[in-house]
Structures are given as C-alpha cells and as structure tokens.
C-alpha cells in the first residue's frame, strides 16, 4: 500500500497530478493549479450526509453516504478515479483534511486493483503550506515595484524578466476598470495559490529578488494577499515611461484588437457584440469619477468607434476615446500617484533602460 505523501514542496515543484475528491462546491471555492475534481459525493449528497452527521452522528452519516454512492453511481465514480490513476501513475488524491473521504476513495480503488497514494492532511495542509510560502518569501526575499502611466507596457516588461511575478496574469485581469478578459477570473483562493506556486518555483531556481507591478489591492475580483499588499506600500519602485503615441497604440492593441479577438474566439458569432457591451460597461464603471459631461462625450466617441469597427473592421476611431481617457482621467491620476510615491522611485526610463536596470539591479 502506498504511503501518504506529505512533501507538499515536492508536489508543487513537480506539478504532481492530483484528483480532488471534495464536492464541486468546495472545489469551486478554491483548489490548486492543474487539479481535476473527481468527487466522492455531489453537492447534494454531501449536504444530506452533513445534515445526517449533525442530527444522528458519524456512523449514521457513513451509512447514508454508502447508500447514496452505491450501485451504478459507485461504479461510474470508481471508473473515473481508475482512469485518472492509470493516466497519472505519479499522481495523488486528496480530500479536505486527508480524512474519511480520501480513505474511502483509496479503499475502493484498492478493491479495483489500484494502489494510489493520498496527500496527508489533504487540501487544508497544502493550502496552509502555500500561504506560508508567500509569507516566507515576503520575509526572506527582495521585491521592487514596476510603476508607470497606463499603456506604458508594464506587462510586456515583466514578460521579459525571469524574476517577475505577473499578478495580473495570475488574476486573468489587466488591473484597470477596462481589465476584464473574455474568460473569467479564478477564485481568490485559486489566485493566491497560483501566486504561491509561482514564488515557490522561482525560489527553487535561485531567484531571491522579484519584480512585480504596482497594483491596487483588488485586481478585478481578486484581492492581493494582505501581507503582500501591505509590504508593497513601502517597496522601492522603478517607473516606466513611454510616449503618448506608443501608449495609445498599445491600448488600442490590447483593449480593442486583442480583446475583441479574444471574445470572438470564446463566444463565436456573438463575440463582437459581447466585446462592445463589455467596453461600454467598463466606461460606465467610472462614470462618477469622469463626471457626466466628460463621460457622455467619451461614451459617444466609443459608440461611434464600435459602430465603425462593426461595419468595416477599422479600429482607428477608437484612438479618439483612448486619447481622451488618458489625457483627462488616467494621466492626471497617475501623475498624482507618481508625485506621492516619488521618494520611493529609484529609477525611471523607457523600456530598454528599465529592462537593463532591473536585470542588473542588486537586492536592497
């Protein structure tokens, strides 16, 4: 019989395949990168067993569980677990605490002729390990923030650095009111877990100094871990600069051309209409901060640009609202932020200079 695995570091460093035997509702709240949910019980079955446990105790709940998962249902679930185990002989299974549910799955697999290891301590122990991983990195490593006006290409700079943490990538969101992607965001727990695994793997490769973008606490619906966000308030900063023309072009590419293509790839014929709706919604989100007259003017420019794009495929008219939004909203806001964080800025420059500086920078 295989021993339980409690080497959580090895599990995440090597991307060990795992099947999560918790109910779907638990899995949706938070899991780990690349894990497959193959539950012992459905949400409804779990709820009934939980109610029975509260009213009649553990033994009655176990009996009910075996009644609910029996016959053809039991055989189908064993087959799914067996298929996973055969496809991933180096894999593992787990439940919430490494308790009864994973023991039952392991036992039923054994009866089907397959010995398969469990994660000792289950989801809870692995989650604690990853939270500790982030805390330890904050205490032991060097961090620097990358700031800059909207559209300067901070994400592209991060993508060229081996020691970057792509917070927006892990959150699947570009970080602004216009940052939502065609695909949804992970749960907050999933976001935190992805970040922790990224930190773990980079530290294993010898990285001890990290670059990350200067972000608000919320990246869309994902909240930065509080210890990370708090530490970011005092970190040194590098400020990325670029011309207005380059910034407008980059925003046009990212938030119009590429985002539209994303929506079409995901939603097919409805893609453009959904993209247009999302763009207008994003502008409406900052209606109060823009003020009524300015919002209305930019809204009409955006509507006209979308109509032209729908008619001819030409995206050039989008430049008008992009330039207006930068000049009248984002740039003044970022100029204020730069002034307030000025004492923390240790270097500023355009792409090449910033890349060179960050690659050569010694930990502080």
From Swiss-Prot:
Residues forming the catalytic site: 95 (s-selanylcysteine intermediate)
BP terms from Gene Ontology: tRNA wobble uridine modification
InterPro entries the record matches: Rhodanese-like_dom, Rhodanese-like_dom_sf, SelU
Keyword Calcium part of the UniProt annotation: no
Subunit structure: Monomer.
Function: Involved in the post-transcriptional modification of the uridine at the wobble position (U34) of tRNA(Lys), tRNA(Glu) and tRNA(Gln). Catalyzes the conversion of 2-thiouridine (S2U-RNA) to 2-selenouridine (Se2U-RNA). Acts in a two-step process involving geranylation of 2-thiouridine (S2U) to S-geranyl-2-thiouridine (geS2U) and subsequent selenation of the latter derivative to 2-selenouridine (Se2U) in the tRNA chain.
Name of the featured protein: tRNA 2-selenouridine synthase
Gene: selU
